[in-house]
From Swiss-Prot:
Disulfide bond entries: none
Disease linkage: Ciliary dyskinesia, primary, 27: A disorder characterized by abnormalities of motile cilia. Respiratory infections leading to chronic inflammation and bronchiectasis are recurrent, due to defects in the respiratory cilia. Patients may exhibit randomization of left-right body asymmetry and situs inversus, due to dysfunction of monocilia at the embryonic node. Primary ciliary dyskinesia associated with situs inversus is referred to as Kartagener syndrome.
Taxonomic placement: Eukaryota, Metazoa, Chordata, Craniata, Vertebrata
Protein name: Dynein regulatory complex subunit 2
Organism: Homo sapiens (Human)
Tissue expression: Highly expressed in adult testis, in spermatocytes and spermatids. Also observed in spermatogonia. Not detected in Leydig cells, nor in fetal testis (at protein level).
Gene Ontology BP annotations: axonemal dynein complex assembly; cilium assembly; cilium-dependent cell motility; regulation of cilium movement
Gene name per UniProt: CCDC65
Length: 484
């Protein structure tokens, strides 16, 4: 009996060992899972702290950056305000001068307007008197012509009405005849259509009956052939059919046995693969989770570095764009101010020069071209062929300035001609002054005249012209002439 008890206790100890081993494995798995959870929680807390710290640092940097930008902006605004105040004072002074000049022009224009209005009213009164007399004469002639036209209209109206009535009767007769012809032709066409329709119907019925008989005969022949072929096939395959049925029964039995054995083998293989798979899955899951956590950590660090770099780049780019925008805006404002000032100067000069325009320039401000239209078209085509597309597009925007450049060129030509004429007159004036001076010098005697060279002027038998020195050798036979 004790031997039997010992033999019975040995398998129980093995089962306990297996249970203890399984419990240890489960405890180790639970400990590993707890460690993984604690590690993931620690990493999440650390990531949250880093995000919180990065947000605080970003807010601090933004506040300091805003203060720096405000200081820079205030300095720029102070400079802009000083520049604007100076420009405003300068513009106010210019405007005051313009207002004074315009007030003078306005007073002169009012005087001219009053004088022109008086002369205009006098001329209008004279024209009204002439127009009333002319209207009375025209009214008399109009009444006479109206009576003659009414008489002619009445006679023409009567003749036209009579002719219209005759034409209406003629057209009614024609319409009745055409309607009768249409009714006759319609009746004949209907009869022809009915006869043709009946003929076609009869032909279709005959063709249909013939085709039906032909098809019925053909179907009967095909059915006889099919019955013969079926009978021959059944007679030839009866023996093969019996052998096939016996083999089919044997095949079903063997297939059932094979299926039972395969199911048993499959169950055993499934159990083995499941146990192996569980072990591999647990090990792989732990390795994969650790690897995923490491990869996530590296990715988070890389993304954090990228975000910091992008933030610095974006800040530098925004600062550059802001500086460039301010510089470009200031440059554009200056250019626009120059253009506006230039336009105002042009308008002022135009108003000032309008006083000095002649009557011809007021009536025809733009001179007509000397060239013919064909020559102008040829010149325009040549210019367009030589220019590029961009220049042509730009020139289209400035077509409205042609009249301005006409007046400008006209004024420039007049200026050049006046300068040339002035130079000629100054030259003539200088020559006349020189001639007048020579004439006056020949008439009068003064210190200036005495100091200048003059071959006609002799004082004490001596001229003021420089004479060349002559050396003369005295001979014994020569006589000296007394000086006069």
């Amino acid at each position: 009996m004790p031997k039997k008890e010992k033999m019975a206790k040995t398998p129980l100890s093995d089962e306990k060992q297996l249970l203890l081993f399984q419990q240890k494995l489960l405890a180790e798995e639970e400990m590993a899972k707890k460690k993984e959870r604690l590690l993931s929680q620690f990493l999440k807390d650390k990531l949250a702290k880093e995000e919180h710290n990065s947000a605080l640092n970003l807010n601090k940097i933004n506040t300091q950056w805003r203060t720096v930008l405000r200081e820079v902006k205030t300095r720029e605004l102070h400079k802009d305000i000083e520049i604007l105040s100076q420009t405003f004072e300068r513009v106010v002074d210019c405007k005051d001068n313009v207002i004074k000049s315009l007030a003078k022009d306005l007073s002169e224009a009012e005087e001219q307007y009053a004088h022109a209005l008086r002369s205009h009213l006098h001329n209008v009164d004279q024209l009204l008197a002439l127009q009333r007399h002319r209207l009375s004469l025209l009214e008399e002639s109009y009444n006479m012509e109206l009576e003659a036209l009414t008489k002619e209209f009445e006679t023409e109206r009567k003749t036209i009405i009579d002719q219209h009535e005759k034409e209406i009767h003629y057209l009614q007769d024609i319409f009745m005849a055409m309607e009768q012809n249409y009714i006759d032709s319609e009746y004949e066409s209907k009869l022809e259509f009915q006869s043709m329709w009946n003929d076609l119907k009869n032909m279709n019925l005959e063709e249909k009956h013939f085709l039906r008989l032909h098809l019925e005969n053909r179907v009967e022949d095909l059915w006889r052939k099919f019955q013969d072929v079926l009978k021959n096939y059944t007679d030839a395959t009866e023996d093969r059919k019996a052998a096939f049925e016996t083999l089919q029964v044997k095949d079903e039995k063997s297939s059932k046995e094979i299926e039972v054995q395969m199911k048993k083998i499959q169950k055993l293989q499934d159990a083995i693969t499941i146990s192996k798979g569980k072990i591999m899955i647990h090990s792989r899951e732990s390795e994969d989770e650790n690897r995923y956590i490491r990869n996530d950590k590296e990715l988070v660090l890389v993304q954090l570095r990228k975000l910091k770099a992008q933030r610095t780049q974006a800040r530098a780019a925004s600062q550059k764009n802001l500086v460039r925008l301010t510089l470009e805006s200031n440059a554009t404002l200056k250019a626009l101010r120059k253009i506006v000032d230039k336009g105002e100067k042009i308008l002022k000069l135009a108003e000032i020069c309008r006083k000095f325009e002649t009557e011809e320039e007021k009536v025809l401000p733009f001179y007509s071209s000397v060239l013919t239209p064909k020559e102008q078209e040829g010149i325009q085509k040549n210019n367009l062929e030589e220019l590029t597309e961009e220049l042509t597009k730009v020139m289209v925007d400035y077509i409205g300035m042609e009249n301005f450049w006409k007046r400008y060129n006209k004024v420039k030509l007049e200026q050049l001609s006046l300068q040339h004429r002035r130079a000629q007159l100054l030259d003539i004036n200088g020559k006349l002054r020189e001639m007048l001076k020579q004439y006056l010098d020949g008439i009068s005697v003064s210190d200036e005249v005495l100091s200048q060279l003059n071959p006609l002027f002799i004082v004490n038998y001596q001229s003021n012209l420089l004479q060349p020195l002559s050396i003369r050798i005295a001979h014994p036979g020569d006589k000296q002439h007394p000086t006069t």
